[in-house]
């Protein structure tokens, strides 16, 4: 946004970058100034996004406008991946493009959503870290772009992969499906309810994901800006070959934000090592396959003793062998839940309905025998905390209570597709 190139020398030394930010976070000093001291291009354009992160109309200037879409006649080929940390923006812009462009332009355009991470959207490798997909997931994307341009500009045959407006690779089924729109990919909704249990409700003593609502004890956890145990995990490297690989970065590090964003789909540390900063729910083994295609949602009621808190939701498949595979996630600053650019502060001690309605797009067949796992936790890390200019010494910890009576049991909505 500052019309400058990415600082790959700075961004590429991930271990050093994490250490610099962690030092400032631990001291309670400005991470913005730490970034500036490390050589990052911190200017007014960057600070605009740091100081005004509220989603809403304030971000409208970065988007192409309806009249701009309506005026152009150029088709597009948009490529992203289920584990691409930029998939949210890519898909949002595609939907905006479809809504405001002419029918003729849309008819000649395509969206491809593979199983890839961000680097995979350049080269189409059929794996993300330890997660390996079937042979059809490997696509020569440079050749696809070349052949599509020849098709659009010179009338050459359309690439075989682009047989429908939207092409989705459904992991687990390991096949491509074509649909006329993203919305058409979801045929139904599977609803699950979360039930609390007595105890810490961590990964080893979790609550339940069930087929019907039921009474259970409320779940309580803490969002403490002074608790740096999650940040300490981010100082540790991922085992060689296990995390996301990029020619622009060195040894992959544990990274909360990138894990939530999808780039490290087999990393479960930020769920397993909650340390009282969140709660976990696990289902019984599925009796039938569940093909999740679309945007999940989670609706719950909570009470907080502070006017705000930052929360993350992580949805995983746990295979019969115990492997963890990310399905989707969401991040929410509770005061920004209206997405209107403003803040609606929580009333401490008052029960508030909260909807997590901006999950990442998911496209995966969860096989019978696997389990669903949902983690709700404090969203704070080296790269995302509530005090980028320095943490006040008296910054309060928030105590969050999720209600679990049957009438207000948390409700998980899973969009499903029928591929059989």
Language-model segments: which ranges?
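Accessory cap/linker subdomain of secreted extracellular hydrolases
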Residues: 1-71
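A catalytic-pocket lid/entrance helix-loop region that shapes and gates access to the active site
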Residues: 1-31, 82, 101-146
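C-terminal, loop-rich substrate-recognition/catalytic regions characterized by aromatic stacking residues
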Residues: 26, 128-420
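Active-site-adjacent bridging/hinge elements
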Residues: 52-69, 110, 114-125, 270-276, ...
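Short, proline-enriched alpha-helix->beta-strand connector loops that line the catalytic pocket
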Residues: 70-76, 107, 187
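Short beta-strand/loop motif that positions the catalytic acidic residue
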Residues: 78-80
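Acidic beta-to-alpha connecting loop that harbors the catalytic carboxylate
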Residues: 82-84, 116, 197, 379
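Conserved alpha/beta-hydrolase "acid-adjacent" motif
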Residues: 85-91
């Amino acid at each position: 946004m500052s019309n400058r190139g990415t600082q790959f020398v700075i961004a590429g030394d991930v271990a050093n970058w994490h250490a610099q930010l962690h030092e400032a976070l631990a001291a309670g000093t400005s991470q913005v100034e730490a970034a500036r001291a490390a050589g990052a291009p911190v200017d007014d354009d960057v600070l605009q996004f740091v100081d005004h992160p509220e989603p809403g109309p304030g971000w409208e200037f970065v988007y192409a406008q309806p009249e701009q879409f309506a005026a152009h006649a150029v088709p597009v080929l948009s490529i992203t991946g289920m584990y691409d940390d930029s998939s949210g923006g890519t898909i949002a812009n595609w939907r905006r493009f479809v809504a405001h462009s002419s029918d003729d332009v849309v008819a000649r355009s395509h969206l491809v959503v593979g199983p890839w991470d961000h680097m995979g959207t350049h080269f189409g490798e059929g794996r993300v870290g330890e997660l390996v997909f079937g042979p059809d997931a490997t696509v020569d994307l440079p050749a696809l772009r070349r052949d599509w341009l020849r098709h659009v500009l010179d009338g050459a045959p359309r690439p075989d992969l682009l047989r429908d407006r939207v092409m989705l690779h459904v992991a687990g089924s390991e096949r491509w499906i074509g649909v006329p729109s993203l919305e058409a990919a979801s045929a139904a909704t599977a609803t699950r309810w979360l039930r609390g249990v007595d105890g810490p409700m961590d990964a080893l003593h979790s609550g339940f994901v069930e087929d019907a609502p039921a009474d259970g004890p409320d779940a309580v956890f803490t969002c403490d800006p002074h608790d740096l145990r999650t940040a300490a995990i981010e100082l540790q490297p991922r085992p060689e070959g296990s995390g996301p690989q990029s020619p622009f970065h060195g040894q992959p590090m544990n990274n909360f934000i990138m894990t939530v964003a999808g780039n490290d789909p087999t990393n479960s540390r930020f769920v397993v090592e909650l340390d009282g900063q969140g709660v976990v729910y696990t289902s019984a083994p599925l009796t039938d396959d569940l093909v999740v295609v679309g945007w999940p949602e989670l609706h719950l009621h909570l009470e907080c003793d502070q006017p705000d808190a930052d929360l993350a939701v992580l949805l995983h498949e746990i295979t019969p062998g115990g492997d963890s595979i990310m399905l989707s996630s969401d991040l929410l600053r509770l005061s920004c839940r209206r997405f209107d650019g403003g803040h609606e502060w929580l009333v401490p001690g008052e029960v508030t309905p909260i909807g997590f309605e901006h999950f990442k797009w998911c496209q995966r067949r969860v096989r019978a025998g696997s389990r669903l796992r949902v983690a709700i936790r404090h969203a704070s890390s080296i790269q995302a905390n509530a005090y980028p200019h320095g943490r006040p010494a008296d910054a309060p910890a928030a105590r969050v209570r999720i209600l679990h009576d049957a009438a207000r049991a948390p409700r998980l909505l899973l969009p499903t597709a029928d591929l059989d």
